[in-house]
Amino acid sequence: MESALTARDRVGVQDFVLLENFTSEAAFIENLRKRFKENLIYTYIGSVLVSVNPYKELEIYSKQNMERYRGVSFYEVSPHLYAIADNSYRSLRTERKDQCILISGESGAGKTEATKKILQYYAVTCPASQQVETVKDRLLQSNPVLEAFGNTKTLRNDNSSRFGKYMDVQFDYRGAPVGGHILNYLLEKSRVVHQNHGERNFHIFYQLLEGGEEDLLRRLGLEKNPQQYHYLVKGHCARVSSINDKNDWKVVRRALSIISFNDNEVEDLLSIVASVLHLGNVQFAADEQGNAQVTTENQIKYLARLLAVEGSVLRDALIHKKIIAKGEELISPLNLEQAAYARDALAKAIYGRTFSWLVNKVNKSLAYKEGEFPGWRSTTVLGLLDIYGFEVFQHNSFEQFCINYCNEKLQQLFIELTLKSEQEEYESEGIAWEPVQYFNNKIICDLVEEKFKGIISILDEECLRPGDATDTTFLEKLEETVKNHPHFLTHKLADQKTRKSLGREEFRLLHYAGEVTYSVAGFLDKNNDLLFRNLKETMCNSENPIINQCFDRTELTDKKRPETAATQFKNSLSKLMEILMSKEPSYIRCIKPNDAKQADRFDEVLIRHQVKYLGLMENLRVRRAGFAYRRKYEVFLQRYKSLCPETWPTWDGRPHDGVAVLVKHLGYKQEEYKMGRTKIFIRFPKTLFATEDALEVRKQSLATKMQATWRGFYRRKKFLHMKHSAIAIQSWWRGTLGRRKAAKRKWAVQTIRRFIKGFIYRNHPRCPENEYFLDYIRFSFLMNLKRNLPKNVLDKSWPTPPPSLCEASQLLRQLCMQNMVWTYCKRISPEWKQQLEQKVIASEIFKGKKDNYPQSVPRLFINTRLGNEEINAKVLQALENEAIKYAVPVIKYDRKGYKARSRQLLLTQNAVIIVEDSKIKQRIDYANLTGISVSSLSDNLFVLHVHCEDNKQKGDVVLQSDHVIETLTKTAMRADKVNNININQGSIKFTVGQGKEGIIDFISGSELLIAKAKNGHLTVVAPRLNSR
């Protein structure tokens, strides 16, 4: 990097304007050589950048380096592409004027690489968003796609552009790229069918064969070996060490997806590329009449499938020619030479039109879409021109003629904008100036493009005139028309010495870049660009969507003769010149250091030739004698008026006087500027940069002042708006409150009136007079009921209803009780439910009948009063599988003597069992239990009545239990004898056995006493606990 060098003299000056001997061409070239040796490939001539192709990678294009040049004044950093790119970008943003960067130089000088580096710089340094990033990617990825289809390896350049490209990049008001458009010029279609020795066809053919997947190649009917294809072997240079076709194929496939190609479009596009290769392999043989016949049917099959046409129709179209004369169709066979011409013409037409379609497809992808960038309608444009350089080959044909004509037009533009226009401007503005001599190539441009007498006009005339026109007749017409032109020479017009270097079918033009000898062979054919009608018809019927778009059916019906290739190119160049003239140009002049494409090799002779024909010395002399910056007074004053108190904020006088006051305030020295008639001219860039720096500082203070003023204005405006809003809200709110209050009063009066009237009619049937009162009464009762509902089923409270709601109140009370009961039942556990069921049965049996029942109510019934451990194991064993449901200790009284004996009463699933220690004394099946008797007193005796016909039973059983209510309830439920419990008053009779009866007498007394009476009865004295 230049910034790392301490001795600037050792590496030359970075601006040729600083050369002491600026008129010496040798000094100019020596300065280039010094810098090239130190890898300093960029040098300025004022604002023009001179670039020497290093033929090697240099570490000067990193993102860090891009940031170094971002937003920095032109001369504050060392010369670089990025400086030119950034200067154009800043001019575009600050002055809102379209810019263009013109990159010129001969083939191999590095123009295409320069274009890519500039696009990369904008992609990194411009403002970004998701949509903008998409546009950036598409702009960058359009390059590898167009290079694959439009670039090739030539003798002088391994990546030579064989078409001209002008790209417009659209920027929004923030400086972000939002779209783009590409114009292409004169694709070298002849390369599809013919290449010179050491050259290749277009890159895409080799990339497809080298990088294409096996499945893809099989579908396209291709093999990986390029030697198998007639159109790829003519240059004998299928593989090049500096080109990696396989990697480039991956780049192209990725780029196609980024610029919105779907899979079907890629397949159709590659089918067309493959069809060109197959078309080149179509061979012909002559029949007995000398007419051509296709000998490679296999190729026709592939072509029919790839181009989506009828194979037989395509075959016939390749060996026949259709002519329409006076409304009649005439079909004539072709000979071998004509058939080969037709095949090659079709291959060139397919590829050329597909390339144009491809450019249009890329343009659709790059097009600025307002929907994606809402509100960004104002856009400016920066153009990049990358067009073929001046070409001189051993054999120069129609393509070189057009390319060199294009370079003449660009040189003319350069002269117009930098040399001639600059000197004319000094004269018109009255600025003292020493004229600089330069060669004006307008004379050469006129020789080529002049109407009626120019080479293109003569060529078109020969192509269009009736009769047998040939390349030779064209040359003769040239000799006749422009024989006296100083820049034109042929074998016939040359002197004896010159004739030795000129063939009889050649002419020589003395271009601004030197002499070029052109062979007229093929000029007429290439200018006509003829494709037989039946081949056009075949392509128009193709079902391949791309081919269908490329070959328009209107061509078949349009009787107007199409423009020739040279005229189309001339008109395209004319439009391009108009585009470039409308923009503010920046120049990059590219130089090729040697023809061998070797790094670190400086061919002084070759470079001197390029310096001369690029007009760099004339450009340098103009820059040394002239001024670096000039602007109209109005523009200059508008931009810098804020730097002077007298001109800010407005100047009411003449702009000339305002600028004079401004530069005086800025302290410009007399030698630093000149005042013209309509413009100010500033000689030194440093003067302008100092002014720009002062403006940047001033902008900060102005921005602060503007912000303060705006904030004050905005706050005051906001305050006044809030004040007005507050007054409006207060007024509205006071009105609202008043209206609410009036409405409330009116409602109150009406309510009171209706209430009183309803009260008067309260006992009448429902009518309009009392419906409001009745509704209010109903509502009040329901609200009161809501607040005073019973809390549980035992709560019997209920609000007293009005007379009209008695029936409804009763229904509601029932519903409420049902709901509480349902809620309570839903909440109780199975154990508690069982307890309640037993209590309910006990209530049904004993309530109001048994004196000691009330004392049993608060006591819970127990599942059993004896555990298994309290029952003898022998008893349990004897019961086997019978589960004991309830067990309780009891006292048994003998049937005769009424002796009391301790026993256990067990209830099983099927029987009542009485147990004495380890022995079962008596088992009474529930079926044999006829009833149970108990007294109404508070004693605990009860009698189990047994069926008398059962011989196993000894008679009824008299028992006493401390839990008589519990025991009898469980026994009744188990035996299903709830209705068979008898509660007796006075005495109970029971069966003793053998038809005898016993009697138990019950007497009220002060305390419990059980004894045998003298009359043989069992007397039970029991205290009365409750009065009935």
Curated annotation (Swiss-Prot):
One of its GO terms (molecular function) is actin filament binding. It is found in: Cytoplasm; Cytoplasm, Cell cortex; Cell projection, Ruffle membrane; Cytoplasmic vesicle. PROSITE patterns: IQ (PS50096), MYOSIN_MOTOR (PS51456), TH1 (PS51757). The modification N-acetylmethionine is found at M1. It holds the Pfam family Myosin_TH1. GO terms for biological process: actin filament organization; actin filament-based movement; endocytosis. Residues 699-728, 722-751 form the IQ domain. The modification N6-methyllysine is found at K348. Keywords: Acetylation, Actin-binding, ATP-binding, Cell membrane, Cell projection, Cytoplasm, Cytoplasmic vesicle, Membrane, Methylation, Motor protein, Myosin, Nucleotide-binding, Repeat. The keyword Cytoplasm applies. InterPro entries: IQ_motif_EF-hand-BS, Kinesin_motor_dom_sf, Myosin_head_motor_dom-like, Myosin_TH1, MYSc_Myo1, P-loop_NTPase. Its main location: cytoplasm. One of its GO terms (cellular component) is myosin complex. Binds directly to large unilamellar vesicles (LUVs) containing phosphatidylinositol 4,5-bisphosphate (PIP2) or inositol 1,4,5-trisphosphate (InsP3). The PIP2-binding site corresponds to a putative PH domain present in its tail domain. Belongs to the TRAFAC class myosin-kinesin ATPase superfamily. Myosin family. This is Unconventional myosin-Ic.
